[in-house]
Structures are given as structure tokens and as C-alpha cells.
Amino acid sequence: MSAHAAPSPEALSRRAEFKAAKTEMLERFRHAANVASLMHALSKLTDDALKRVWDECGLPATLALVAVGGYGRGELAPYSDVDILVLLPDAHDAALDARIERFIGMAWDLGLEIGSSVRTVAQCIEEASQDVTVQTSLLEARRIVGSTALFERFTVRYHEALDARAFFTAKVLEMRQRHAKFQDTPYSLEPNVKESPGGLRDLQTILWIARAAGFGSSWRELDTRGLITDREARELRRNEGFLKTLRARLHVIAGRRQDMLVFDLQTQAAESFGYQPTQAKRASEQLMRRYYWAAKAVTQLATILIQNIEAQLFPATSGITRVLSADRFVEKQGMLEIVDDGVFERHPDAILEAFLLYETTRGVKGLSARTLRALYNSREIMNNAWRRDPQNRATFMRILQQPEGITHAFRLMNQTSVLGRYLLNFRRIVGQMQHDLYHVYTVDQHILMVLRNIRRFAVAEHAHEYPFCSQLIGNFERPWVLYVAALFHDIAKGRGGDHSTLGMADARRFCREHGIAGDDAALIVWLVQHHLTMSQVAQKQDTSDPEVIKRFAEVVGNERYLTALYLLTVADIRGTSPKVWNTWKGKLLEDLYRITLAVLGGANPDAHSELKSRQEQALALLRLETVPDDAHRALWDQLDVGFFLRHDAADIAWQTRVLYRHVNAETAIVRARPSPIGDALQVLVYVKDRPDLFAGICAYFDRNGLSVLDARVSTTRHGYALDNFIVTQTERDVRYRDIANLVEQQLATRLAETASLPEPSKGRLSRLSRTFPITPRVDLRADERGQYYILSVSANDRPGLLYSIARVLAEHRIGVHAARINTLGERVEDIFLLAGAGLSDNRLQIQLETELLRAIAV
């Protein structure tokens, strides 16, 4: 705000009058929703108010008040900044400064967010030459009041100094840098309607560079100039209108400048457009899908327009480089170009051929504006007959089966909408958001991310990322089978019903239509049906139980199916969100793969033989550590079979080395080390057992910002708890070796205390979880052998959640035998193996479930 004295009664009256007029306009917009009328009306209202203040300040007629930026073009969003320039003559009285300052202060007092500058014409030109942002703002300058002659002199000087080529280069670079800030995708969970790729700023950038080049300042003028077609101009106007309306509604809903379509506002924004929730889709998901389609269209058309403007500003010095396909395609300056605009109409099969050539031709880095435009205008050609054409089906399979370039080809096919035209069910999931707190990409982007992940396994340059996956895919015959499965694994999302079952039918039909038969077709369909199975077994079941492995091996059946499912599962989890995958999940999946492979190879999943094997391996490791030969017996004699099945040989050896001298320790033994699998800390606790032990340990982790990934709890025959935890530090980067000693000391001290369990901290939910809460679920049932009870908990993730659960269990003196903590983005699906007297009592079960639901409630 201005630094001058408090507003006068007259200023307050003007402010109230301005606010009332603006409020009336916003109310009309709420009902009529004509965004162009609103923006122009707000601009005129602001013009009139500033003129009155200008006159009241007695500023001389030799000055000019100029609107710049969006205000300059007469487009004010409800709470946009009002950018103004006070234009001074070259010779001016320094005494004017006080009056200009008073004018700016009074403008602020109107309630406007003023962005002001005071310059001479020469200063404007100098600033513009040094800063493309200033140059852009001045491009749309409009006189509000004051000297017409001075403003015209400024306009002439500005355009004389404007270098259209340099301006084009600077604005395109600026756009690329802006896109990079948004990860080069319009498919953000919370897109910025103005700044994100495919947003309003892209449309403005095109009009700026066109205006600077003298090609026109509206879509109609660019159409007349031949830079776009009449159809493209209509599409641009339609999507621009939607984006402007959406931005204005965000401002009105928020009551302030708000260009980010944040979770908190998505539902209200959707309702303002008339969207209503259905059984299959939230109102917000319907709005977001419309937004993504608009942003996608803007991105496509912007690419075409920028290439066309570039071609006019920078005429090519060389023409055709080489002919790629007779009567169809040439390479022109590294871009694939059709020989004339009628190629796709004469040869519909050339549409997919374009992507095959892009994929397979070295030196071709993209599609030219002419080719992109022809694709954009060929939507009617891509009909049922085109989809059924055997030539097109063969070309599509060739694209899938190339040794390289597949990911880029499919991304480009999606960007140009060709993929959705060829696979109609894929079109249904383009731009479909998944508010499941797990996926952070739209369904189509997730599918392409999974395809990309599988492809990276096969690329030598990326073999270091997941060497085991790269090794497996290197020996996997016909890996394109995996690519087809990736395309269809989530294609039925959002239809209602089981998407795996519905996707199977789509995959089966695709195989039949594309000549995929026998085991390849069977494997593709099976993968779509079971694409969630391996992650569910690895993350939610006790894989130390031979029966679990035996059942999973029966589902898989053979090594090829197991390898295919493993590769798809890793790629799928990694393609949901950068936060979901971690090395611990990778180890769970790899361990499940290896033990299942052994069973498929004839190994008997027998607990006794597995126990003997692990003990022998552990003893060999202990000998390397110079532990006396019989030193392990005192500890091992107190451990049950379950302990040896839940830990691998290296882990058994480490725990034995730590504890063999302390089997009857009077105080807690706590040891911590960086987890052998990386990115985590392994914490061992050995202490006399008590009912609240697990809860007490969880309380310590909660208070110190450590998240539990896995807990393996054992009770010795002589009453000691031997518990192992894998924990991560969630809030910051940390070297686990540096905090290991601190954890050992603090946790041992905590366990020596007799204080009652503290109240759980009710940590704040993320904005995503607050906006899209999931219904918490608790399920308690006996395991198949009746030995333990399995507790399943599903809820929004938040700090203190695990401890809240553990505390309820401790209050009922229920022991936790094992815990599998499965964090999926913003939600958790935790599994606990419980033991305790009375768990078979239905009344206790109901009471326990009720208290747990209360404890995990948001």
C-alpha cells in the first residue's frame, strides 16, 4: 500500500463506490458467465476510476496515463494486478513527482493492486531493450488519459526499436523455461491456469510474437494472414474462452488473485460450471478432464503456430533434405513433413506411417507444423473403417515392436490425439484424473509412464537404474508383449466396475484384431487381469509363509509369466508417483520374485528346509565375523521358526552378532544401522516383553519424525521381544549413519522409562488428503490357520497414524506379531498380524474396530 496519510472520507467513498460496482459485475458474471464482457467491464470501470483520480490530482495535459500488460489489452481478471505507466515528456518539472506519487497512492486507495512505473519515452525504449518482460508489457500499451501526441510518439519509437526476430527468440525461450518449471506437462494435479503448459500464457505468447511481427493481434487476423485455418481459429477462441472463464471463476471463488487450480477449489470451480458428481466420477474430475483437453489442444495448436511464425520470420536457407516415402513424406530441416496437405486424405494409412517414420528415421526430431496441422484436421478420417484397416493394424504393431523410439512415438501419438483415435477406449481416459491419493498423473499419462519405465529396463544407458529388471528383460522374448499389457492395464479406469476385468476384455479384443494369438495373447490378457496381484502379495501378505508363496506360484504358473508380472509391477508402481516407489518396496518385490522362481523351478516351499538353509548361511557369515562357533546357541535356542523365516541369512547373522552376549539382558538393547537395501534405517530392539512395547516404540518414532515402513516382531521363549523396524526420515534429507547412534541412545532411554503412553499427535493432513479424504476402513479377521488375527487398516496418511493404531492395540493388551506398513502416496494400507487373548470374542472385535476407526479418523 501507499505510504501517504490515511484515506480521506472522499477516498473512502470512492473506494466503496468502486467496490459496489465491481461486486455487481461479479454477481452478474456468476449468473451469466460471459467472461469477455466481465473483463472489458472491469477494465472500463478501472479506466473511469483512474481518470477521475488523475483529474483530481491536477496532472498536466503534457503527461499520459497508459495501461500496459493485460490491462492494456482491456482484459482484467477480477483480482488481477492493474499495471500502469505514467508517461513523461522529455522535459518535465521535478515538482510533478509529488503529484504523481499522490495519484498512485489514491489509486491504491481505490482497492486496486497497482503495478506502476514512471518513465519518459526514451527511458521506456531503454528499459525495453534490456528486459523482454518490459518490452512485452509495453507491446499492449493503451492510453487511458492525457497527451495523445506523447503516447503516439511513444508508440512510434517503440515499434521502430522492436526487433521482431529477437523478440520471437526471447519469448520462445521464455516459454520453454516457463514450461520447464511445470515439468513440461499440462497434466499437473494443480495446474496454473495462466502459466502452465497449455495455459493462457501460451496463447498470449503467440499473440505477442504475432503482433510484434506485424502478423496481427487476434485469432481472426492470424486466420486472414494464413498462419492458422478458420477451424483452428475457432478452436483457439473456444479454449481461450474456457480458460479465461475458469481463471475468472477461480478469482471469484477465492475472493483474491488465484490462478492455481488447487485441490481446495476444484470442487467449487466444477460446480460453478454445472458439473455434478456421478457414481463413476467426482465433479472435480469432470472439470479437470475438460481442462486437460483444453490445455492439450492449446499445446498442439501453439506448436503449429510457433513453427509457422518461425518459418515466416526465419525463411529456411535449405529446402528438402531427403525423400522418406514417395508421394507422402520428406525430411525438412530435421522435421517430418508431408509433401502436400492432401496426403492423409488420399492415404489414410499414412497417418500411422508418420509415427513409424518418426520412430525409425535417424535425424528426424519431430513433426513439422504442416504435418501437425494435417493430423489435427484429419479427425474425421480416423473413423471405424480406418481403425479396422489391416494396413493400419500392421503399422501400429510395427510401431510397438521397434527396438527403440517407442516411448517418444507413443507420447507424440497421444499429444496429437492419434492414439486416442486409434484406441477409442484410450481416448476415454485421456485427461482423466485419479483422486485416489495414489496416482499423481492422469490415467493416460500414467499408462505412458509405465510403458516408458518398461522400455528403460531394455535401454543399456539406463541399466544402472534397475539392474535386475534390465537383466530380466534382456532375456525376455518378444518384450513388446509387455508394452501391450502396459497400454491396457488401466485402460478401463473410471468406467465403474473392476477395471482389471473390463481391461481384460479390451486387451483380448485388441489381440484378436491385431493377429496376436496363442501364449502371447494369453499372457497379455493375464497380465491385465493380475497387474495388481504381485504388489498386493509382496506388500500385504506374509511372504515368509510357505503357503503364501505356494498360492502365488500357482497363480503365476511359469517363469515367463512371473517375469512379465514382476517387470510390469515395478514399472507400474514407479509410474504412479515419485513418492510411492522406494528401495524397500523394490526389495519386497524382488524377494517375492526370487523365492517364487525357486518354487516354479521345483523347490519345495517347505519351512523346515528353508529354516535349515538360512541357519547354515547365517553361521557361515558369523564365522567370517570371527564369532565363536557355538556362541549363537544361547540366542537361537530361544527363537521360534517364524523368526528364521521372516529374516534373511545376513539379517539373522547381524542380529545374532549383536545379541549373543546379551541373551538375558536386564536393560533394553537397541541397535541401528543404515538398512542394507538403502534409503532407510534398520532399528533392532531387544528387551523384556510388555503389552505396550510396540506402541511405545512407535511413539518414539512418531515424536522424532521417523516413518515406519516395516516391522517384524518376535517373542523369545523366555519372554523377550526381538523387534526389527525399517524406518525413514520423512521431512528432510538425512544420512542415516549419522543418526543411528542418536536413535540407539534415545530409544533405549525411552524404553527404560515407566511413563504411560503419550497422547498421539494429530498431524495435519496434506491439502490433497483434506480435499479428497478417503473413508477409513478397518477389517479384523482370523488367518486361515486360526493362529493369528489379521488387521487391515486403510486411511489418509498423516503423522502419528501408526502410533494411534498401536496405542489402541496396547490398551487392549493385544500383541503385534508383524506389521506391514504400505504407504501409497497420500494414503496408507497397513496390515498387522495380531495375537491376544479374547480376539475371538465378537464383542471385543466390534469394540476394537470402533476404537480404531475413531483413532484414525481425520
Curated annotation (Swiss-Prot):
One of its GO terms (biological process) is regulation of nitrogen utilization. Gene3D superfamilies: 3.30.70.260, Hypothetical protein af1432 (1.10.3210.10), Nucleotidyltransferases domain 2 (1.20.120.330). Keywords: Hydrolase, Magnesium, Multifunctional enzyme, Nucleotidyltransferase, Repeat, Transferase. Residues 1-324 are annotated as: Uridylyltransferase. Coiled coil: none annotated. Residues 443-565 form the HD domain. This is Bifunctional uridylyltransferase/uridylyl-removing enzyme. Its EC number is 2.7.7.59, 3.1.4.-.
